Amino acid sequence: MLFHIVFTTKDRRPFIKPEVQPRLYSYLSALVHDRFGRPIRIGGVEDHVHMLIDKNPGVNEPDMLRDIKANSSRWMRKTFPEMADFAWQVGYGIFSVSAPHRQMVAEYIKRQPSHHRRVTFRDEFMRLLKRNNVEYDERYLL
């Protein structure tokens, strides 16, 4: 089953600099591949990550996200000692993706840097929630 997953750095701090991004995305890709399914596209900008994955059957989504975030936080702090206070924000967005929309979502993730020159994360995330008919309270969105 295909999923589009979005999560942010704690307090949306800009930890994921362009020079860090390829290494983090490679790490996340290997982690997903080894434990949870097939990574299709991983990308983002300095304060958040998008992943499109084809999840293995039987994998529990909350457990998967807890493991991905915990392991990648440890990896970031170990790999980049100057980021000793790196952490992911509590919570995430996870949206199912139909097969016909797979390529569109993959391209959307690929275009994140140019997309965020025009659109804030908050606006982007609210659009994703609305598009996927997820009820939310704006008070709890960063």
Predicted feature residues:
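Basic nucleic-acid-binding interfaces
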Residues: 1-142
